[in-house]
Amino acid sequence: MTTKEKLSLLRNEMKANGLDAFVVFNADPHMSEYFTPYWEERKWITSFDSSAGYVFITQDKAVLWTDGRYLVQAKNQLTGTGVDFYIEGTKDAPESDQWLLDELHQGAKVGCNALCTPHNTWVLLSQTLKRKDITIVDAPLIEKIWKKRPKDERQTIYVRPEKYTGESATNKIAALREIMQKKGVTHFLVTALDDVAWVTNLRGNDIVFNPVFLAYLSITPEKATLFAELKQCDDSVKAYLKQHHIELKDYHDFFKEISHINGEKILLSPDANQSIFNTVQPKNTVYTEVSPIQLLKAVKNETELEGFRKAMIKDGVALTNFFCWLDKNIGKVELTEYSLGKILDKFRAEQEGFLGNSFAMIVGYLG
């Protein structure tokens, strides 16, 4: 299916739902920097596969905003697709929210998948659109037309031993409860995957280059509940959670569970997805501020610092081995940036404790 055909299907859905415009952000429900192919809605609808960019679609226009790193890529991938683009921050690029406001009539309606939209972005867009009484509504339309969507694959969750973390999950949860008490909140809903992994000392491989797993975490003064795919948790993980007094519930039960919260004071990051706010805001008082987990994990304990030191030494050994190999082989075999990157990966993988790279190698044009 071509991009133009996909846009035509989407516009039919927009018309059927009374929408004058539709916004697709590059995000998953946890606002992860990297995410699984299942959530690549912007990539699917536009055929633009960079890591940055979002698209605004009306009945007669589709415009994508991205940054200067992807100028050449945008030209190559979007030309002739029916999707125009702007490079943010350049003199010819309008502010995206203002562009949408100018394109729409008084009282128009804009659709967006709230599950993949951070709350702060939703609020800012709503404030701009309010100038013309334009409303933004939750409308997950992509799922209606993306028929061959990839499966949302999950991998086994595992425990990160305390000899690496330097602090137990029990102590971390206790510290968060102290913060909650000082702030006067009764519930803390943790939505960022790295935050969930840090608090629980659990890791996974659901997202390439990121040792995390898809999950939410709810903390109250009496209870901590991890919402994760049950089949990802073997008996050892279940026993570990029980040891640290963390209840395990299915990932897909999260919204049903939080819909029962009533009359409470809830702490949420402004980066949490708008669907969570839509669920809890009507019946509770919601406080939005930077997750206290971000602040806690920014201060490394001595065990973590020692881990950094050891990692740097191991990486230094890998680099030394790589340079020795290069010195012996340069001029004897054909070498490209890509092939050198694979060789460097091999030397790093030889080091004890290697789990994988933190991002894909960045290779120059034509490798």
Regions found by a protein language model. Name each.
Residues T2-H105, T117, T121-H260, Q351, ...:
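N-terminal accessory/capping or targeting/presequence segment of soluble
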Residues A16, T220-E222, Q281-V286, K332, ...:
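Secondary-structure transition/capping motifs at alpha-helix termini
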Residues L296-G367:
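Long, K/E/R/D-enriched contiguous segments that form extended
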Residues G111-P118, Y164-T165, D195, P292-L296, ...:
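Conserved short loop/turn motifs at secondary-structure junctions
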Residues L124-K151, N273-G307:
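Terminal amphipathic helices with adjacent charged low-complexity linkers/tails
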Residues V72-Q73, K144-R154, Q281-T285, I313-N321:
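Short, compositionally biased low-complexity segments
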Residues L100-L101, A108, C112, V237-K300, ...:
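Conserved catalytic alpha/beta cores of large enzymes that bind or transform nucleotide phosphates
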Residues T3-L7, T90, A114-W122, G166-T170, ...:
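Generic detection of long, well-ordered alpha-helical segments
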